[in-house]
Amino acid sequence: MQVIRLAALSDNYIFLLHDSQKNIAAVVDPAEAEPVLKQLAQLNAELVAIFNTHHHNDHVGGNQQLIQNFPQLKVYGGAEDKGRIPGQQVFLQPGDRVQFTDRVAEVIFVPGHTRAHIAYYFPPQTADTPGELFCGDTLFAGGCGRLFEGTPAQMVESLTKLRSLPENTRVWCAHEYTLKNLQFALSVDSENTELQKRFDEVKTKRSQGIATVPSLLGVEKLTNPFLRWEQPSLQSAVNSNDPVQTFARIRGLKDKF
């Protein structure tokens, strides 16, 4: 399974999963249809599935046009998003499995950004290959999603689930927010040398127009303040020793950054 990253809108990423042997594809969070249709035409591939993480328009905006072009495809989303995802046919529960070609993804319930948000995790096929995590707007490179429908406690629980995955997991988040996220991270975790190093690397990449997605989960655990709420330096920065309160205060600062 090849993952093809497609740029969309102003800062979105759409992910096309392609099986070159069967010449079929699935798409994760099609913000718009045109980039997907263009890539499918280049591959001469049939689209068989849409995997939506949540209902926001910049993740489902392309659903209807893709359905019109490929009427046989199936649209997957969280069960609690029923009525909010265009064309949804499959209503996923936590722990469900979804299959694309020979790969099977675990459905992880990650409320916080929205009340129904899910992530799709494809475990590694061999010991030396990475797993693939499609996490929508729950976990970003260097950050996390705003809390529109969920609570800090829910988001901490959700991020704890994602944080427990193998460190070599590739994190395919849906936006190119990394540079600004790391600028904020330095404001609350300025002594973190791994973070300083990552910021410099990302700044160089973005100045050259290079994407910073995917990232590696192990790097996120060292540098992303929204996975580090137990760290004394971060707790001190927001004057709290409670993990959920620490997270909530960091999130509040980021909302105003």
Swiss-Prot record:
Pathway: Secondary metabolite metabolism; methylglyoxal degradation; (R)-lactate from methylglyoxal: step 2/2
Gene3D superfamilies reported in the protein's UniProt record: Ribonuclease Z/Hydroxyacylglutathione hydrolase-like
Any GO MF annotation of the entry: hydroxyacylglutathione hydrolase activity
Binding site for Zn(2+) 1: H54, H56, H113, D137
Catalytic activity: an S-(2-hydroxyacyl)glutathione + H2O = a 2-hydroxy carboxylate + glutathione + H(+)
Cofactor binding note from Swiss-Prot or TrEMBL: Binds 2 Zn(2+) ions per subunit.
Signal peptide start and end residues: none
Residues reported in the UniProt entry to bind Zn(2+) 2: D58, H59, D137, H175
Keywords: Hydrolase, Metal-binding, Zinc
Pfam families, per the entry: HAGH_C, Lactamase_B
Catalytic activity, EC: 3.1.2.6
CDD domains: hydroxyacylglutathione_hydrolase_MBL-fold
Top EC class for this record: hydrolase
CC cofactor: Zn(2+)
Biological process according to GO: methylglyoxal catabolic process to D-lactate via S-lactoyl-glutathione
Self-association and partners: Monomer.
Family as reported in the entry's similarity comment: Belongs to the metallo-beta-lactamase superfamily. Glyoxalase II family.
Chain's role: Thiolesterase that catalyzes the hydrolysis of S-D-lactoyl-glutathione to form glutathione and D-lactic acid.
Protein name: Hydroxyacylglutathione hydrolase
This protein's encoding gene: gloB
